[in-house]
């Protein structure tokens, strides 16, 4: 039988204060990052939707979902990491404090002369590359982006729209990253990659810190509306940079009251799940084309910076079928009339909704839901990381029933 959900409970979860250090993801860092983003063009707090009807229907205390389709006009959260990493890199280059730096200051003639030769290069399925291209565009700098085989032509065009050079390669994601790395070394470009390996850790750390803005906003939005803090946090993962960033912030913020953290990946690219199954404490890779509709999660090699955070704080690792992402997209787009706010959630953004719905509706997974303590006392926080970044694929799934 083909399982829609495979799971592995984490035997290595640590009590607060005994696991991987989180000093680079604490509240003070989060507020510094947020202050930087507030100075960027088009900054606005993204919505936090209260899915009250869905939570009642599923027998849960509450469901809130952060809608990152509104971020910087980029239709995804990734611009947070790319822009902050660009800011940190240029602050170091100019020997100034990022807290006193803004993109407006970087656009003065004196500073533009000092940074004019910077070229940023990265690999992406779309969202991260668009964020890097957008950040470079704000400063009149060049970006070069490599995309894996099978990438959406529309996503590539969106990257080129920001003035970047963009190539769809014949490589899978991890090999496209290696290509970007080689080109940076050969041409003296600046590699802005959202994953890390031995010897390349500083910039990926900055990117992870950049993602903290959405976590800080979500925490503050819950507080402002007198909503309960999450008992459950469901985070989707590719290499794990986003998941590590958001869980790191919430663990540091909530300390002994750490939520039940569930990390979900596509079956075809479930490197964190496989690492948990191996249960030796080390990150493990998956290889191949990793064909999944969740293109933003089609990554086979864990980020070595985020892995210890994920290993020490995740409650359960879940590997999910593509049909759950498709179901989440449809549920988000078409709630019952007059109930929850409809919103556009793309393939990688909607997996949390689809997973939660399946866990609470399919009797086959009732024991798993019980073990995860998903009941009337559960308050679940989800992040919709993207909107319809490839509108043709979105329409095919939501209207035509692809991956049903």
Swiss-Prot record:
Database matches in CDD domains: Trp-synth-beta_II
Molecular function via GO: diaminopropionate ammonia-lyase activity; pyridoxal phosphate binding
Pfam family, one: PALP
Chain positions found as N6-(pyridoxal phosphate)lysine: 78
Cofactor: pyridoxal 5'-phosphate
Effects seen without this gene: No growth on minimal medium plus DL-DAP; growth can be restored by a mix of 8 amino acids (Arg, Asn, Cys, Glu, Ile, Leu, Met and Thr).
UniProt KW Chloroplast keyword: no
Record text on activity regulation: Competitively inhibited by L- and D-alanine.
The reaction(s) this protein catalyses: (S)-2,3-diaminopropanoate + H2O + H(+) = pyruvate + 2 NH4(+); (R)-2,3-diaminopropanoate + H2O + H(+) = pyruvate + 2 NH4(+)
Enzyme class: lyase
EC number: 4.3.1.15
Induction or repression: By DL-DAP (at protein level).
Stated pH dependence: Optimum pH is 8.0.
Record-linked InterPro entries: DiNH2opropionate_NH3_lyase, DiNH2propionate_NH3-lyase_sub, TrpB-like_PALP, TrpB-like_PALP_sf
Biological role stated in the UniProt entry: Catalyzes the alpha,beta-elimination reaction of both L- and D-alpha,beta-diaminopropionate (DAP) to form pyruvate and ammonia. In vitro L- and D-isomers of serine are also degraded, though slowly; it is the only serine dehydratase which can eliminate an amino group at the beta-carbon position. In vivo L-, D- and a mixure of DL-DAP allow growth. DL-DAP is toxic in the absence of this enzyme, it may inhibit enzymes involved in the synthesis of pyruvate and aspartate, as well as amino acids derived from them.
Subunit-level organization: Homodimer.
Membership in a protein family: Belongs to the diaminopropionate ammonia-lyase family.
PANTHER family per UniProt: DIAMINOPROPIONATE AMMONIA-LYASE, PTHR42937
Protein name: Diaminopropionate ammonia-lyase
